[in-house]
A protein has these predicted regions:
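Charged DNA-binding/catalytic regions of mobile-element recombinases
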Residues: 1-154
Length: 154
């Protein structure tokens, strides 16, 4: 499992928008949630609300998560919300080497795909006024990505 934070852009009247992405490197199933900050609690939220329930529904378990050393993922293990959450869930946390984004290449490629196939296209056609509107469109794209795109790609 790979996780990362991606800066999507800025919405007028809202501010900066970040995408918390999670990718199962084996199945290539992806999850994404948009937030106006990149805090540890948002990283926990996407795991707790979307990823772990998906695995539980499929009677599977997440054993390891790979992230960069961003402040939203790393800190003192006894105080950092993300680190504490992973400990409580029994998930091992591995980090990439500094300045080596290719170490987390699966998620970097997902970001490129999301940018090319979703954000750039929708951004030209749709005037978003809220993160919720953006999330609705992202959810539709991720549904396509997870169910249709890989069937054709093989």
């Amino acid at each position: 499992m790979a996780v990362d934070t991606f800066f999507v852009g800025a919405l007028k009247g809202v501010g900066k928008v970040y995408l918390q992405t999670v990718l199962d490197c084996y199945s290539r199933h992806a999850w994404g949630r948009l937030y106006t900050s990149k805090l540890p609690i948002t990283s926990v939220h996407v795991l707790n609300e979307a990823v772990l329930p998906f695995f539980e529904a499929h009677e599977a378990q997440v054993y390891t998560i790979l992230s960069d050393k961003g402040r939203e993922f790393c800190g003192r293990p006894d105080h950092h919300p993300y680190e504490l959450f992973l400990q409580l869930e029994g998930i091992e946390h591995r980090t990439t080497k500094v300045r080596r984004p290719q170490s987390n290449g699966f998620i970097e490629r997902l970001h490129r795909t999301l940018l090319d196939e979703h954000f750039r296209i929708k951004g030209r056609r749709t005037w978003y006024e809220s993160v919720e509107q953006m999330q609705t469109d992202l959810d539709s794209y991720l549904e396509h990505y997870n169910t249709q795109r890989h069937i054709r790609a093989g």
